[in-house]
Amino acid sequence: MRKTHFSIVLFLLLFSFSQAQNNNTKGIPPAIAEKDLTAYLFVYFTGNSVEEEAVRYAISADGYHYYHLNNNKPVIDSKVISSTGGVRDPHILRGDDGKTFYMVLTDMTSSKGWDSNRAMVLLKSTDLVNWKSSIVNIQTAFPGNENLKRVWAPQTIYDAKAGKYLIYFSLQYAGGPDKIYYAYANKDFTGLESAPKLLFVPKSERACIDGDIIEKDGIYHLFYKTETENPGIKVATTTDLTSGKWTENDNYLQQTKDGVEGSSVFKLNNSDDYILMYDVYTKGRYQFTKSKDLENFTVIDNDISMDFNPRHGTILPITRSELKKLITKWGMPDKFPKINNNPVLEGYYADPEILYSNKTKKYYIYPTSDGFDGWSGNYFKTFSSDNLTDWKDEGIIVDLRKDVTWANRNAWAPCIVEKKIKGKYNYFYYFTAAQKIGVASSDNPNGPFTDSGKALVSTRPEGVKGGQEIDPDVFTDPKTGKSYLYWGNGYMAVAELNANMISIKEGSTKIIKVDDTFREGTYVIYRKGTYYFLWSEDDTRSPNYKVRYGTSKSPLGPIEIPKDNIVIQGIPDQGIYATGHNSVLQIPNKDEWYITYHRFSYPTGIKMGDAGGFHREVCMDKLEFNPDGSIKQVIPTHSGIDAIK
């Protein structure tokens, strides 16, 4: 897992652990890592006829080129979710938990008049495909709204201070201008907690509609359309959403003389740039502008393409798995670019172990849970797949704080083996905890796992003066059926496991000599009479972290090291760094092999300094052999592998 001298590592670990204990919110992985936001969903409606007043979807790989889904037909039936038979102005938000989505809509058909609606629609989803909806009629739900004329363009933002979702919208009462109001949604997102309250009224006290709020650096920016003699888009800012204290910017932000409305702002993925777009409704088109400061905007219309004509909508950054769900449901647009399959897991993970289960006929990845400051994670997860490209999070399988009595920190570098004992499949899961190695067992590859109750390896082998007892690898020799445990940072140790797989055969521990490139992460495979020993060189925080190999005629060595023995290393020109700590998968009954490994998270890991070494992601590429049995150097890719059948 890590590659530094033991004394330095121990100091850093203890310091990191102490800091984490003092502040358990520090260095916790986000619900959604920005590096996993790789595409965009555009939610919109198309016009003023009843058929056009419905939610439609489009997708983009880069935020500039958009392709409609479902043949540009509605993805939600307006008649089912609304009181008027039509909906407009869709706004979509990713929830604070990262996995729940909230959409709000104007409940209105324009054919009945611009003052005909009193309601909005609230929707909630966990997959962007299936939505639960509720109608909120302001006039009937809250007394005192008899003079309410219309409810327009609702939107949602998470108010971290209140811990609630704030819905804001414009209301117009008889004899008065449109003003922007707000109310908090109830816990189920099916209604409002209270009657609407004023959120914002411009100094001009003239009408304002189509509010859109985005937070940047602790400041909330409210973009809105003002209905003065010179209508257009302006912005006001505050540090407290509901304080009523807004600072207005008098400048107009639209970059056209044509009439505009329905502004919306989103941040480009893995970028400092923001896009402000708005509906040029008098010309039937959209305009896109770009900014870094949310004050100065440049038109980028020449960079934008769409194969549809949207009206007022919003754009949501989405992950690859979310994109795939949309495509599975509504099809892949003909011109949409090929989707990369690396990294194979979303989120921060490292030290991947991969297994094919003969019991379930599925593939499993067992990684280190990464993204914690100083490698301070304390639980392990597993992920399953039928095709090696689409992975399901199976949840936590070992939590050191709950499931292990002998250690509660630094959950690192697991490995697993499937053994058939007395006709039943058993799974033995070896893991590092607090620089010791333990083992847990289960009847299923996704658990639950039961810890053995004590560390399997807790001290250095005899004669070893430095390093750490980490990075276990388990290998069953197909020639003898014996199973071996390998481990070590700074040294490579091996011991034969007893038949129970949870204890080491007495007197079997030995040190295998490797060259100076060995640091950690031993992995052993067998192919056509040859044992291949793979290991990682350098420090996991180093951009030069890589995998090398040697061969042997025995699982106990000695190891012969080829002249050109790099298995995989980074490609700086492609932003790929620190490709290491691997495992290898052989497709059952085939001479077909794949290597899983971690790398710095792309594209920002290389900019993180040492933190890049605990913000890693898991990738997979094909592993091939030359005719003489030597390993071809793997070229790491962003595209990854194609799904297997």
Walk through the language-model features, giving the residues of each.
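Bacterial Sec-dependent N-terminal signal peptides
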Residues: 1-26
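Carbohydrate-active catalytic/glycan-binding domains of CAZyme proteins
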Residues: 22-645
